[in-house]
Amino acid sequence: MTDLTIKIGGNYVWIDAAVVDSANNKTPLDLVGADPATCEIDVTSGKFARLVISASGDQGSQVTADVLRGEKSVCLKRFYKINADGHLDRAVTFDPDA
């Protein structure tokens, strides 16, 4: 198992996110706290995992996503903008053991 810390921030009205690990286990993120909202999870070690984000807000608003192994080792860092229709749907693959 690999311990991950997920941080999602930005200017959004609503957000939903999950991590799917290499064993196809889906872990919905219970994001808590202020910007950035944070969640700690365990995933099966393996070649990949996917972070899946759905959000809504004002067009052009930025959403940030950071995945850390432990508290400091960065596995993933992404910046997205909410689309013209007010929605954002993204899935990105990363190595949880990196």
Cite the ranges covered by each PLM segment.
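Short, glycine-anchored, charge-dense loop/turn motifs used at functional sites
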Residues: 24-25
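Beta-strand-rich recognition domains
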Residues: 1-20, 41-98
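Short beta-strand segments within Ig-like beta-sandwich modules, predominantly Fibronectin type-III
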Residues: 28-34
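Short, surface-exposed beta-strand/beta-hairpin micro-motifs centered on an aromatic residue
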Residues: 36-40
